[in-house]
Amino acid sequence: MFKTLKKLFDNEYKELYRFSKLADQIDALDEEMSKLSDKKLASYTDKFKKRLEEGETLDDILVEAFAVAREAAYRCLGMKPFYCQLLGGLAIHYGNIAEMKTGEGKTLTCVLPAYLNALTGKGVHIVTVNEFLSTRDSEWMGIFKFLGLTVGLNLRELSFKEKQEAYNCDILYSTNNELGFDYLRDNMVVKKENRVQRPLNYCIVDEVDSILIDEARTPLIISGGVMQSANLYIDADRYVKSLKENEDYIMDEKSKAVSLTDEGSRKAEEHFHLDNLYDINNTALVHHINQALKANYAMSLDVDYVVQDGEVVIVDQFTGRLMKGRAFSDGLHQAIEAKEGVKIQQETKTLATITFQNYFRMYNKIAGMTGTAKTEEEEFRNIYNMFVIQIPTNKPVIREDATDLLYPGKEGKYNAIIKEIENRHATGQPVLVGTIAIETSELLSKMLTKKKIPHEVLNAKNHAREAEIIAHAGEKGAVTIATNMAGRGTDIKLGEGVKELGGLCVIGSERHESRRIDNQLRGRSGRQGDPGFTQFFVSFEDDLLVRFGSDRYKDMLKNLGFTGDMAIQNKMFSKTVESAQRKVEGNNFDIRKQLLNYDDVMNNQREIIYGKRNEILDNDSIHETVLNGFKEYISDIVNSHLVESNKLKENDYSEILEAVNENLLRKYRINLSEINGKHPSEVIDLIYENALKDYEEKLEDIPEEVRDEFEKAISLRVIDNYWMEHISTMSHLRDGIGLRGYANTSPLQAYTMEGYQLFDEMIAKINRDISIYLLKSEIRQNIERKQVAKTAITNDSKDHAKVQKKSTKVGRNDPCPCGSGKKYKNCCGK
């Protein structure tokens, strides 16, 4: 009965049933396709394109297109996609995630939907987590070239012309980072011909869970350098190092948040010679202290970062790789440099930013593939509208997954791991040990060295040999220690005689916060029906159980004499571990969802600004838009005097005149008698008419093309300057918005409302400055459009673009920069 209900209501079952019917039809064409000549098989591409032009849909040609691509794969590579790979390809075509076990041929699977969707001519992006995989997978391009399609490879070092050529190909292989950075750079160009991307159509994301889940909280940032005194970081670090936990500062183990106590604040005032640490003039110092606290007590050497060649280098928490050239933001990187006593680098200012969540949601259709996604299906469905379809394996999985071994402490656990490795190594069985932290991999390495057991260590410190180490990890007698499953994306193939020894033995040194990461480690063994064995060793001292485990079980076992090297292998305790993992997964999902809610505010604003930029770049003339901007600025000046009532007072007229005569009007200035007593709308119309006369006279002898270039150059520069500042302002707003919860106010609601208020103010300032510059600047021939900062260098490079800062001192009798029309001394300068 329950199986019947599952068939009726389970989306995955229904989809697999539908795909199997289509796969049968594709399979039925196999013999027909195999009889065709190469020329005739390749000619199908043009036939398919013509049918699409005549109004047929991709679904109409799907069966034939898959059959053609399947046969082409066999002729080019000698590999014909299995039936299960047809199912995976169909799942991907329909915008789902195909969960396929390690070794089931995901790379070959994606050839089928990529070919079909490339026939539209709108472009297909195949996305990988690093350039090694992009380069490796693009070698499959022979299939596409055989079928008459163009294929590009998007690498970081390409020039913009080479990138344009790559993006114009039917199929593009790229990393997720490079796609995102290209998008941001495209929205900072000052000429449309310098863009590289086409409209985003369809993408297939390999290791989709890594990119859309693990990296979802990490924004892509293009940044420029900002000078900040290194002494302040050093002084804050010196002060923080003198503090005592629980007396001067407290740390939340779950969130890793660190904050000063009252006593810590008192000591800060004493150290920095202040009356009140939290005085408004000390906000920069408080920020430096907070970052120093985080650097010293929440960030760990060889876990979150390493020190290499006198530099702090970030460790990717999900891949274990070093992220050379990248820097923690908001001064945290500099605080860590002060902590470790290395040279303090220049701080950065954000010029453009986007998260992967919002970037990938811009595609018309998105799909993915991975070996582990089912545990995160709710998140994929809610955020990306993708279902996870578990594709049956070509051969049954015969790997043995043993129940966890639980130890009282880490010492006993590590001794047991070494003994297990020793026993299996003695038989010649290859062993792969997965660790979470670099320090664990190095500790186990030292213990193995003492036992004189030859082994390889694969972590962020030696990832250059990754492919070589992984290639030999399945050979007889091999022992490999890998941090956070470095080497993902590369299969571990068993050497000669290893099957008879039981296949690859995988040992987990502790449970990861996510069951999905544990499943990835297990999945390294037992590929394509091979034998294998997996076992996790856990202890009550592991971070996961310290933070989320049950003290009740720990105390109960302690009372029963559970100490030292003793171990328990019980499903009840394994469920305790899984329960802790579910708590963390749920917590992390909530965090990512909340972050997306916040990021959506910024995303909507980004779309408006980028829309304005694209309008400037794509249109031959923006003259009408500029004139509308004049009127909006004049309306803002007049409306700023209508806050208390709908009528203008006597002194309002004189203040409005003072503002427009100084900032806008030159020849056609207005007298008080011309507007006194008039309705606000009449005042706006009169000022606008005179501004228009002034501007038209200014343009009298200027060719239209010069006028258009002048208006575009001014508009782009003003928009880009204000957008850069707005990103920083919104970042500061977000940093402090959490405190609103203490006032029974929703932080998200407050952030949304205040964020849009700041955005409206920015738009008003943009209209103001464009209007003033256009009316008061001298029009020059051959005016050059300039970017506000260099964009070729991003936050994952050692160097940073320099921000061109404009310093303007406002005089007491000058118009207030807020745009009110009042004098500075009577407005913000009071």
Q: What positions do the PLM features span?
A:
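Generic detector of short, well-ordered, non-transmembrane alpha-helical segments enriched
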Residues: 376, 429, 477, 605, ...
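A short, cysteine/histidine-rich metal-binding "knuckle" motif
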Residues: 810-814, 819-830
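Conserved P-loop NTPase motor core
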Residues: 1-561, 610-611
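Hydrophobic, well-ordered secondary-structure elements that form the walls
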Residues: 433, 481, 723, 759, ...
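Extended, charged helical/alpha-beta scaffold domains that provide interaction surfaces
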Residues: 306-313, 319-326, 528-529, 541-809, ...
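Short, Lys/Glu-rich amphipathic helical modules
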Residues: 427-441, 619, 645, 672-676, ...
